[in-house]
Amino acid sequence: MLLSLENEVDPDARYLGDALRSLLGEHATYDYVREGGRPALDRFDDLDGVVVGGSTAGVYEADDHPWMAEEAAFVRELVDREIPVLGVCFGHQLVNEALGGRVEHHGLAHRLVTADLADDPLFDGVNRTIPAVHGDRVVDPGDGMAPIAATDDYRYFATRHRDAPVWTVQYHPEFQHDLLARIREDFGWTDTDRSWADVTTARTLRNFERLAAAHSR
C-alpha cells in the first residue's frame, strides 16, 4: 500500500492530486495542508512507500505554511528509515530542500519537453516527451540526491538518492492529455511540435509502486 501526501493549498487545483491518486493502486491519503504534523506510520498496515504530491505553493513560502517544515521533517524520517519515497513536482522540490538542497522560482513553464532520462527502473517505459508545468526549480540537489533526468534548461529535472529508495520528478505523471484543457485554462500552455501520443509518464507511478513493493518484501 502507498501513502499519498496531499499538499495543494488551492482548492481549485486539487484535481491534479485527485488525478494522481486515480492512477495509484491501494493507497491512503494524508492531507498535510489541513492536518499538518506527521502521519503515524503504524496506522498503515503493509505500507510500501510514500508519494509526496504537488502544490501551487512554493517550498520557500514555509513561513506562511508551517506544515511544510513538518512535512520536511517527516521526509527526513522516511529517508533515514529507508521507506521508499516518490516526490512529484512540489514534492520533488520539498524532498530535495528537506535534504539540504535549494529551490528557486524561475517563472512558469507549461509545454511538452524532451528529457534525457537515465537508465533507471523508475523510467521503464517512460518516453522522453514529458508535459512540464512548474514555476520553481531545484537548483542544488539535497544531500545524497543525484540527477537522473534533465532537459535542455533544467539539470535536476528528476533526482534519486544514492543510498535510500528515494526518487523525485519535476513533472506530473498524472498530467495526461485529458487534463490539457483544464491546465491550459488554469496555468496557460505553450504548444510545440512535440506529440501527446508520445507521452507515457503515467508509467512512472506504476514503476514506483513496483519498486516500493519489491523493497518492502
Task: Locate each region found by the language model.
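N-terminal beta1-alpha1 cap of cysteine-dependent amidohydrolase-like domains
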Residues: M1-W67, E77-I83, W189-R217
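Short glycine-/acidic-enriched loop or helix-start segments at secondary-structure transitions
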Residues: A13-R14, E61-A62, V95-A98, G142, ...
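Short, glycine/charged-enriched secondary-structure capping and boundary segments
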Residues: G17-D18, D64-W67, G100-V103, M145-A146, ...
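Active-site phosphate/pyrophosphate- and oxyanion-stabilizing loops and adjacent acidic/basic residues
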Residues: D18, S22, Q93, G135-D136
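Charged helix-capping and loop-helix junction motifs
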Residues: D46, H65-A72, A149-D153
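Cysteine-nucleophile active-site neighborhood
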Residues: G53-D120
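Pocket-forming structural segment of enzyme catalytic cores
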Residues: N96-Q176
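C-terminal and late-domain segments of enzyme folds
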Residues: R155-R217
